[in-house]
Structure formats: structure tokens, C-alpha cells
Amino acid sequence: MKNIILGGGCFWCIEAVFERLKGVINTEVGYSGGKPNPSYESVCNGDGNIEVVKINYDEKQISLLEILILFFKIHDPTSIDKQGEDIGIQYRSIIFYENEEDKILAQNFIEEQQKIFSKKIVTKISRLQTYYKAENYHQHYFINNPDQGYCQAVIAPKLQKIQSD
């Protein structure tokens, strides 16, 4: 089993896509990249942390490359600290890696993707230093709150688009 930690907008959206994916064993939303011991409130108030999803996956069933391809389909890697109406550093596009092999794969992936995108890809690649699990009410948010307004307006259409691709 391997982990990759991705940030690309609201962590509810990213998790909702990946928790349904064959080969993904578990997802967990959290915070990384900022001050120690964050809370949702401190992240929203600019403590430097990014909303991320830790994806635990079986590399025999799904590759990191496949995960990154999907990641780039579900968020805008050319948008600086903004995804849709969500604005702020906590929505930064980032790949946190745990080993050099994953770093190189991510770098090569972005280089190849840049040939396709007309705008500059701003997704950062950074070694994971610290990761903090988010509050329990954020975990598997879409599954637990499918009728919530944000879920219906933002997450559900994203899932429908991915399923139709």
C-alpha cells in the first residue's frame, strides 16, 4: 500500500471522487503545509495549511499516474489558490509526496501535462513534512451529507462528469 496526499480545492470534492475509485483503500481529509495543530477555523483564517486528501491505494490495482490523471481532471491545476468559488491558500493545487520515486513521477507528469495546457500549471510538488487529520465531521463528507447544498451544487455534478468520462 502507498499514500499520496493531494490538495486541489475543497477537500470534500477531492475525497468524494477518490473514495469511489477501484484500488483506493482509504481516503482521509486533513491539513498540511502550515502551522502546527491546525483546526478548520485556523485554516480558513490563513494559518498556511492546505486542505488535502490522503489517499491510501493499492499500486497493484491503480497507479500513481492514474491517480494524478484523475486529479488533473477534477480540479484546475492552472489556478493559483482558487478552485471555482473557493478562494484562499487552503485551496492551493499541490502534490505532497513521501518518496523520491513519487516526486520524479509527479514532476514528469506535470511536464507532460504542460504540453497540453495553454496556461501555466501552478501545481506545487512538495515533500510531505506534516499531516494533520481534519475534524471527524469533514471525513467522507459527501457520503454522510449528500443532500447538503454545497454537495448538491458542486460535488454531485463533478461526480456525474467523472462517471460520464
From Swiss-Prot:
Range of residues in the leader sequence: none
A Pfam match: PMSR
Enzyme class at the top of the EC tree: oxidoreductase
Catalytic activity: L-methionyl-[protein] + [thioredoxin]-disulfide + H2O = L-methionyl-(S)-S-oxide-[protein] + [thioredoxin]-dithiol; [thioredoxin]-disulfide + L-methionine + H2O = L-methionine (S)-S-oxide + [thioredoxin]-dithiol
Catalytic residues identified in the record: C10
Keywords: Oxidoreductase
GO biological process: protein modification process
EC number: 1.8.4.11
Disulphides: none
Molecular function GO terms recorded: L-methionine:thioredoxin-disulfide S-oxidoreductase activity; peptide-methionine (S)-S-oxide reductase activity
Top-rank taxon, per record: Bacteria
Family: Belongs to the MsrA Met sulfoxide reductase family.
Function: Has an important function as a repair enzyme for proteins that have been inactivated by oxidation. Catalyzes the reversible oxidation-reduction of methionine sulfoxide in proteins to methionine.
Official protein name in the record: Peptide methionine sulfoxide reductase MsrA
Organism expressing this protein natively: Campylobacter jejuni (strain RM1221)
